[in-house]
């Protein structure tokens, strides 16, 4: 049987080649980031909140400092990509979302839920977040400015150039706030250049980006009035050779200046400088009408110089291969494996088996088993201060993920899906202690098991409007030594649900609203409401955004308060010149 055919979204995350979303044999959420609706979001992480399986643990607004978790995994077990290139930070997973990605350049965000180490290597235990940009199709200039309570002052600039054979996307962003309370101010600057060229060999993409964030960090990592400044630089080039081969190389530099007492930096100050080099080559070989073999290799090198961690390096190299059997509208089966070698010829083997089958034109079943791993960060290995201590003998985390799902599409504009999953971890890394008076120490847990369910309904309405309802429930079991207190593993959402609507109303206004309810382990449920309204047409587009509309008091990281009701209003100017 053949499934219904409509305009299908193409996905590139969790798969070795682009496939229609309806044909994917993995659990993937695609969050559109159309240019029209970007005016109703402040930063790229806002799109992640539309999937309740993604838990953002923010220490401030507008992605000043945010941890990301998928399916109950901790902050270091989610891999962050930009156009398929790794952005994860080997100093600490707290910086994985410290990215210079401009929201103006996004086309969509793809979220792979479940293990992804067979394709991507270390860190993809809980899942993968891939921010995807798109070359511009027209030449335009966009200017946006806005102000709000808590001293919010924001500006965005974008220049788009589209010519035959090449395009350019230049952006610059500024975000200031005096803070909603003492020592919670922030200043953020970023700029990026995305160049795209089409030639005889194939396509060439050059990505250049930088960001500078300085922010008050009161209570971020303990009962201290701290301050932090993080800078990030990223450069990458990607070259395709027809449709069968791709190569890429990237460089990332990240600096972190941390002051424990903001007004007394001489007491305790850390300076970290991390540099990462990465390269990869992938090739596709057709073995028949429905069979494709994918293979490739990648390597990376990390070097850190730190006043606290010392000087350390880490090199990795990997080879992978996968055979894909796929008949569109009937079935898919993928068998993959990856061998990764690191530090002293130690190695990790990560196999996976995934598949799907159409039972009827409206019903698809899919499932899979996959292995993932994560190498300890430099902070987990070597950090030390009065409150936290690393352990140089930590072992890599291991995880096996299992899932089964059903997708029902009774009509082109209506979809329901439910997924059952379990992740069994071994040597999970967390900070533990026996009493509040002791220091947190990085330790391997023997076993940890996460079991959960995801269910969602998506309904496309007339007038380019869409309504989604989604829920994720989790249960976590672990066996630490009796009497040990956990710092991160226990901070997961037991229940998380969301209702999201966006579309045009009255023919002239864009409306976006989200109602989310979340209950963390051991805590009470709380409600967060977001609302955004903007003019849909014209060169001048006023807008207003409301965050935490109900003025809920809540914490996503224990001990770190989040802002109350926030109102931001502004105007965007669009000028097209071709």
Give each language-model segment a name.
Residues 8-44, 67, 75:
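N-terminal periplasmic "start-of-domain" segments of outer-membrane beta-barrel proteins
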Residues 45, 49-85, 89, 107:
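Extracytoplasmic beta-strand/coil segments of soluble accessory domains associated
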Residues 86-113, 131-134:
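Short acidic/polar hinge/loop motifs at secondary-structure boundaries
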Residues 116, 128, 133-161, 171-172, ...:
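Short strand-turn segments of transmembrane beta-barrel domains in outer membranes
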Residues 177-190, 197, 201-276, 388:
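Flexible loop and strand-edge segments within Gram-negative outer membrane beta-barrel domains
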Residues 196-199, 488-578:
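Conserved C-terminal beta-signal and adjacent last beta-strands/turns
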Residues 221-242, 272-274, 358, 371-426, ...:
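Outer-membrane beta-barrel signature, preferentially recognizing the C-terminal barrel domain
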Residues 289, 294, 328, 422-424, ...:
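Gram-negative outer-membrane beta-barrel transporters
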């Amino acid at each position: 049987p053949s499934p219904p055919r409509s305009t299908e979204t193409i996905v590139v995350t969790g798969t070795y080649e682009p496939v229609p979303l309806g044909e994917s044999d993995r659990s993937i959420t695609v969050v559109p980031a159309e240019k029209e609706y970007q005016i109703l979001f402040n930063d790229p992480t806002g799109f992640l909140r539309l999937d309740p399986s993604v838990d953002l643990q923010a220490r401030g607004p507008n992605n000043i400092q945010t941890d990301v978790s998928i399916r109950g995994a901790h902050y270091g077990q989610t891999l962050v990509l930009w156009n398929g290139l790794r952005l994860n930070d080997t100093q600490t997973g707290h910086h994985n979302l410290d990215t210079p990605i401009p929201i103006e350049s996004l086309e969509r965000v793809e979220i792979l839920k479940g293990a992804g180490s067979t394709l991507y290597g270390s860190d993809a235990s809980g899942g993968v977040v891939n921010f995807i940009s798109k070359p511009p199709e027209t030449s335009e200039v966009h200017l946006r400015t806005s102000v709000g309570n808590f001293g919010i002052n924001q500006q965005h600039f974008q220049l788009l150039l589209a010519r035959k054979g090449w395009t350019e996307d230049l952006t610059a962003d500024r975000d200031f706030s005096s803070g909603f309370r003492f020592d919670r101010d922030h200043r953020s600057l970023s700029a990026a250049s995305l160049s795209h060229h089409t030639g005889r060999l194939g396509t060439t993409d050059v990505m250049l980006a930088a960001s500078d964030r300085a922010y008050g960090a009161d209570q971020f990592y303990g009962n201290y009035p701290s301050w932090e400044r993080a800078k990030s630089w990223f450069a990458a080039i990607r070259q395709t050779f027809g449709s069968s081969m791709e190569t890429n190389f990237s460089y990332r530099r990240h600096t972190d200046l941390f002051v424990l007492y903001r007004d007394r930096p001489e007491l305790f100050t850390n300076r970290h400088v991390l540099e990462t080099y990465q390269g990869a080559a992938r090739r596709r070989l057709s073995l028949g009408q429905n069979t494709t073999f994918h293979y490739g290799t990648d390597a990376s090198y990390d070097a850190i110089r730190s006043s606290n961690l010392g000087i350390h390096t880490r090199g990795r190299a990997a080879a992978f291969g996968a055979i894909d059997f796929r008949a569109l509208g009937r079935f898919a089966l993928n068998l993959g494996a990856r061998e990764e070698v690191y530090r002293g010829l130690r190695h990790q083997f990560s196999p996976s088996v995934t598949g799907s089958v159409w039972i009827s034109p409206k019903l698809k079943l899919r499932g899979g088993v996959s292995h993932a791993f994560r190498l300890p960060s430099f902070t987990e290995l070597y950090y030390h201060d009065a409150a936290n201590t690393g352990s140089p003998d930590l072992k890599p985390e291991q995880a096996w993920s299992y899932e089964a799902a059903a997708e029902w599409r009774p009509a082109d504009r209506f979809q329901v899906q439910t997924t059952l999953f379990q992740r069994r971890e071994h040597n999970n890394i967390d900070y533990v202690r026996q009493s509040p008076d002791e220091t947190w120490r990085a330790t391997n847990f023997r076993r940890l098991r996460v079991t959960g369910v995801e269910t969602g309904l998506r309904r496309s309405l007339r007038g380019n409007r869409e309504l989604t309802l989604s829920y994720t429930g989790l249960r976590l079991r672990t066996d630490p030594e009796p009497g040990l207190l956990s710092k991160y593993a226990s901070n997961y959402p037991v229940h998380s649900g969301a209702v999201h609507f966006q579309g045009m109303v009255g023919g002239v206004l864009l409306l976006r609203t989200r109602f989310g309810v979340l209950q963390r382990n051991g805590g009470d449920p709380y409600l967060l409401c977001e609302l955004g309204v903007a003019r849909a047409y014209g060169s001048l587009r006023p807008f207003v955004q409301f965050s935490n509309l109900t003025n809920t008091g809540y914490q996503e990281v224990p001990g770190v308060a989040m802002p109350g009701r926030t109102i931001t209003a502004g105007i965007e100017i669009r000028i097209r010149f071709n």
